Amino acid sequence: MSADILNAQHNDDTFENIWQELKWRGLVHVSTDEEALEKALSDEKLTFYTGYDPTAASLHLGHLVQLLVMRRLQLAGHYPLGLVGGFTGLIGDPRQTSERVLNSREVVAEWVQSLQSQIERFLSFEGENAARMVNNLDWGGQLSAIDFLRDIGKHFRVGTMVKKEIVAKRLNSEEGISYTEFSYQILQGLDYLELNRQYGCTLQTGGSDQWGNLTSGTELIRKVEGKTVHAIGTPLITNSDGTKFGKSEGNAIWLNPKMCSPYAFYQFWLNTADADVIDRLKVFTFLTRAEIGEYEHKVETEAYKREAQKRLAYEVTALVHGVEPTEQTIAASEALFGKGDFAALDESTLQTVMDELPSVELSSDRLDLITALTELGFASSKSEARRILKEGGASVNGVKVQGEDALISSEQLLHGKYAIVRRGKKNQGAITVV
């Protein structure tokens, strides 16, 4: 994220305090003592942390919720610690369904670097409350089995641990749960204890599905240090129709542009349902309560214009990928829907658009539209392709073509080797000349 975007971000000063804003935005599902936490956030400048385990090469939309909570707390004057789990990532937190595959130390170390780079883009590392990055391998990697059992494990009761929601589900499943994953909650509790000792950290934030792990830390600090510390669990974002948020055709929406292009990312947000878009604006943008209220009115009165979805898609894509790639993405989207010029797109953006379309490679001596339509599957035969062309039902790069012998000329090729072929209103495909 650019410095300009970071500098433009601010909390809504119409709220009494940051706690009230977090609650209004729907970012608090569960917490430790609410009254004490609100008072601490209002009266003190807390050091807080959020942990991210390197179980993949990129963060995804679920992590974006946590990153934005961190940024909102930082804007309120609190001190952020971004923890990447080079230690806990060697195990991975228990999943609801089955045991994780253990990744090699080399892969985990590589992913740690990748996640650190991503997290750093969402926080400010300048000023009085500059963010800091930490890696729990720094203390966990030095811990012997004896020290772990004597100094940490002694404070955990198995009866309490097995009641944690995910552990209980796994224990009742056919596969069960290994001691490795069962012990994960102890390791996360250790993180909070170490950060409390080293940095005076008194607040941890995370997803509500991690609540058992969060409270492992608060309880460990209470037993070992005799201190009361805080935790916030954010809700798991769900769609109004019951489908899982953060997935597109079953695939996670990653924050890394190499794993999910800015174009695909933008389209994901643009397709948000009317019933969900206001909640998404609250969680994923820095728009004020008044601004979001205006979009709520537009959804109620002019939903067909989809202005709220367009603003949401712009804000979140710019937040994650930057303003320039977002503007290129919007230009690409408009071109695909016949409202823009493909020739105005840079090659990188054009390629990301083509990745979303059916595509074929054709040699320079086969650039006739009959071949293009049949190879793309837009015509079942050459005779059908001729009929489509005769009726003017095809276009190249948004320009309608007609005539059975129509060719894609070298002048029409985008960046010297690409073309977008359309049949009718819905069928579009990409041609690459080889």
Per-segment meaning from a language model:
Residues 1-210, 218, 225-230, 243:
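NTP-dependent nucleotidyl-transfer catalytic core
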Residues 116, 184-187, 193-196, 215-218, ...:
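Predominant activation on well-ordered alpha-helical scaffold segments within soluble catalytic domains
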